[in-house]
Amino acid sequence: ENPWLKLGLDENGYPLYILKSFEIATKLAPHIKLVYNQNSGMQTQMWEKIKNTILYVRSKGFRVDAIGWQAHILLANSTKEIAENPNQELKKLANLIDWAHQHKLGFHVTELDYFIQDTSELKKGHKNQALIYKKLIKVLKDKAKNGLVTLNLWDLSIRTKKGKVGEFHSIYDANFKPTPAYNVIKKALKK
């Protein structure tokens, strides 16, 4: 449940907490980039709603400088498709980045990590993670030719989530040795 929705909606059905956030930030943080950051997968209907919300926020005279995607891959059902159908889902991401650039917005992939439920299969999990990261970075590098695109990691090693079996993995293992995902990112940066 989103408690912020208890603040209500405006006359056009847009959440007041979002409008108020961008109104305050536009006024009080003129030198800070304002990012509409979303945690989910590439569900078309959801992103259409977000795009419409961004355009609406801007129509009110408030700044939105970029879209952010919190890329917690396999965190929930909403991000499973990225691992199961990466080509299809990353095509949606590419289209979303194109839309952002067409509307003079930067695009940030934030909080990138990869959930491995069965930690007895780390080698397989790390291989799959590296494959997804390689495809993701290819899209990001291609789209960076047309506008601002950034990538950051949620953490550097492993973390767990209370009540959830498995681990979130980044670019180093439990002993801080590079994982295959590290090598994918390093190679991409050298090109």
Please give the residue ranges for each predicted region:
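Aromatic- and acid-rich polysaccharide-binding/catalytic face
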Residues: 28-40, 50-86, 101-115
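Aromatic-rich peripheral "rim/lid" segments of glycoside hydrolase catalytic domains that contact
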Residues: 1-12, 80-108, 113-191
